[in-house]
Amino acid sequence: MDLKHSRSVKLNDGNLMPVLGFGTFASKEIPKSKAAEATKVAIDVGFRHIDAAYFYQNEEEVGQALRDKMADGTVKREDLFYTTKIWITFLRPELVRQCLERSLKKLGLDYVDLCIIHIPIAMKPGEELLPKDANGKFIFDTVDIRDTWEALEKCKDAGLSKSIGVSNFNHKQLELILNKPRLKYKPTCNQVECHPYLNQSKLLEFCKSKDIVLVAYSALGSHRDSSWVSSDSPYLLEDPVLMTIAKKHNQTPGQVALRYQLQRGVVVLAKSFNEKRIKENFQVFDFELTPEDMKTIDSLNRNFRYSQMAFALDHPDYPFLEEY
C-alpha cells in the first residue's frame, strides 16, 4: 500500500482515512486556546484528519474549532475524520464507553470517525490522569486488553465511533486481539511513534500482513515536553541527511520526513501550532522521494524512541520491551 498518489486509505472495515492528519497534543505551557486556533488553520489549509484524545484535555477547544469551520461552510461533518482515544484509566470494559461519551460531549459531536485504545497499560480508574500513591508511585490496574477491545466493539455497534483501533501496541499485543475468540472487528490501525530514527519497519511489515494501517505520531521527531521527552534527545529535523535530501527537492526537512512515511504506506500525523509550518506540513503531495532517497532515510534508523512512557516501565503490559 503506497500512499504516494492517494489522499486517503481504505481501512479493513471499509471506511476511508485521510493519509495526512493534524495532531492536537500540546504540552502544559501552551494555552488551550492555541489548539482551537491551530485546528482552524489546519482545516483552512486542507487537513481533514484531526487526531485528538481524552488525555490531551483540549477536546472542548478542538471541538469548537470543528464546529466553527462547519458553521462557516468550510467543511461538512462527513468531510472530517476525527480520532479520539480511550485513556488508560478507562480500560476496564465497563468504563470504555464512558470515556468516549465524555469526549463526544466535550466535542459537541454525535460520533467520532475513529476511537483507539491510547496505550495498552491500565491504570487505576478515577479522575486523575496519572494516578499516584502517597509515595509518588504510579498506581497500575490489571485489565485484560481483550475485554477492553470487546467494549470498544460495542461502541462501534452503538454508532459512537465509525472505526476502532489501537495505539502503542507491540505485535504480540496486536496478536492477542487478532486471535481472541469471538473477535467481531479487527483493529483498523495501530498508532505508534514513527520517524526516521525509529522507522518501525518490522511492526509496519507485521501490520501490513494483517491489513492494519500503521499511523505515525512524532513523525517530525518530538515535542520537547520534559515530562515525556529527555532534554538531550536528538533534533530529527536538524539531521544533515534529511537536510541534504530536503535541499535537493527544494522542500523542508519536515516535509521530507512526512513524505517518507506516505511513500512507505504509513498514515502520518503532523503537529504544529505555528501557522507557517501547518501550511508547509500539508504541502507533501506535490513532490516525490526517489528510491535512493527512501533507502538513505531508512538507513537513519537507530531505534531511538522519544517517548519511552517511563511512568509505565514496571507495568506487566509495558509495550516497548519487545523488539517490535
Curated annotation (Swiss-Prot):
Q: Give the record's pH note.
A: Optimum pH is 10.5 for the dehydrogenase activity. Optimum pH is 6 for the reductase activity.
Q: Give a yes or no for keyword Membrane in this entry.
A: no
Documented activity regulation? The dehydrogenase activity is inhibited by 3',3'',5',5''-tetraiodophenolphthalein, phenolphthalein, genistein, quercetin, zearalenone and diethylstilbestrol.
Q: Where is the active site?
A: Y56 (proton donor)
GO cellular component terms given for this protein: cytoplasm; cytosol
- Disulphide-bridged cysteine pairs: none
Catalytic reactions on record: (2E,6E)-farnesol + NADP(+) = (2E,6E)-farnesal + NADPH + H(+)
Query: Which is an annotated Pfam family here?
Result: Aldo_ket_red
PROSITE patterns, sorted: ALDOKETO_REDUCTASE_1, ALDOKETO_REDUCTASE_2, ALDOKETO_REDUCTASE_3
- Residue positions annotated to bind NADP(+) are 24-26, 51, 167-168, 191, 217-225, 269-281
Please provide the Gene Ontology terms (biological process) for this protein.
prostaglandin biosynthetic process; steroid metabolic process
EC number annotated for this UniProt entry: 1.1.1.-, 1.1.1.216
- Taxonomically, which superkingdom? Eukaryota
InterPro entries found in the cross-reference section:
AKR, AKR1C, Aldo/ket_reductase_CS, NADP_OxRdtase_dom, NADP_OxRdtase_dom_sf
Annotated residues that bind substrate are located at H118
Cellular compartment(s):
Cytoplasm
Q: Which is one GO molecular function term here?
A: farnesol dehydrogenase activity
Record-annotated site: Lowers pKa of active site Tyr: K85
Q: What is its main location?
A: cytoplasm
Identify the tissues in which this protein is expressed: Expressed in lung, specifically in bronchiolar club cells, type II alveolar cells and epithelial cells of the duct of the bronchial gland (at protein level). Expressed in gastric parietal cells and in epithelial cells of the large intestine and colon (at protein level). Expressed in brown adipocytes (at protein level). Expressed in vascular endothelial cells (at protein level).
Q: How does it assemble?
A: Monomer.
The family this protein is said to belong to: Belongs to the aldo/keto reductase family.
Its function, per the record, reads: Catalyzes the NADPH-dependent reduction of a variety of substrates including aromatic and aliphatic aldehydes, quinones, ketones, dicarbonyl compounds and 17-ketosteroids. Catalyzes the NADP(+)-dependent oxidation of aromatic, alicyclic and aliphatic alcohols, and 17beta-hydroxysteroids. To a lesser extent, can also catalyze the reduction of some aldoses and ketoses and the oxidation of some sugar alcohols. In the stomach, lung and colon tissues, mediates the reduction of farnesal and geranylgeranial into farnesol and geranylgeraniol respectively.
Any idea what this protein is called? Aldo-keto reductase family 1 member C15
Species for this entry: Rattus norvegicus (Rat)
What is the primary gene name for this protein?
Answer: Akr1c15
